[in-house]
C-alpha cells in the first residue's frame, strides 16, 4: 500500500512508465488502483527496442490504461520525493504498529 499511497499523492503530475517490452509511455497520471494499474492522459509512446516501431496512429492517444503487471519501472519528478516517502512510511508505521 506504500506505493499506492505515494502514486495517489502524485495525481495530475507528469510520469514516465517503462514497460517490460521496452516501450516507454509518458503523460499525466490520472488514476492508480491498489494493483498499481495506471491511467495516463496526453500519452506519448517511445520505443527503446530497435525491433518495435511505434505507429503514428498510436502517438495520438488521449487516455491510456496500463496494467500493473506490465510495468517495469516508473519515473516521476523528484519534487519532494523524500518528504512524501517519509510521510507515507510514518503513516504506515502508525497504522501497523
Swiss-Prot record:
Annotated family: Belongs to the snRNP Sm proteins family.
One GO BP annotation of this record: mRNA splicing, via spliceosome
Summary of subunit composition and partner proteins: LSm subunits form a heteromer with a doughnut shape.
This protein's UniProt keywords: mRNA processing, mRNA splicing, Nucleus, Ribonucleoprotein, RNA-binding, Spliceosome
KW Aminoacyl-tRNA synthetase (keyword) present: no
Cell compartment(s), UniProt: Nucleus
Gene Ontology MF annotations: RNA binding
Record-level GO cellular component terms: catalytic step 2 spliceosome; Lsm1-7-Pat1 complex; P-body; precatalytic spliceosome; U4/U6 x U5 tri-snRNP complex; U6 snRNP
Keyword Ribonucleoprotein: yes
Annotated protein name in UniProt: Probable U6 snRNA-associated Sm-like protein LSm2
Domain Sm: 2-80
Known function: Component of LSm protein complexes, which are involved in RNA processing and may function in a chaperone-like manner. LSM2 binds specifically to the 3'-terminal U-tract of U6 snRNA. Required for processing of pre-tRNAs, pre-rRNAs and U3 snoRNA.
UniProt-listed Pfam families: LSM (PF01423)
Amino acid at each position: 500500500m506504500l506505493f499506492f499511497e505515494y502514486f495517489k499523492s502524485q495525481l495530475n503530475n507528469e510520469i514516465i512508465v517503462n514497460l517490460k517490452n521496452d516501450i516507454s509511455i509518458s503523460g499525466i497520471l490520472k488514476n492508480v488502483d491498489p494493483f498499481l494499474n495506471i491511467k495516463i492522459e496526453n500519452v506519448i509512446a517511445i520505443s527503446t527496442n530497435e525491433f518495435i516501431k511505434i505507429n503514428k496512429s498510436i502517438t495520438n492517444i488521449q487516455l491510456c490504461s496500463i496494467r500493473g503487471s506490465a510495468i517495469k519501472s516508473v519515473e516521476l519528478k523528484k519534487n519532494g520525493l523524500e518528504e512524501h516517502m517519509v510521510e507515507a512510511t510514518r503513516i504506515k508505521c502508525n497504522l501497523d504498529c
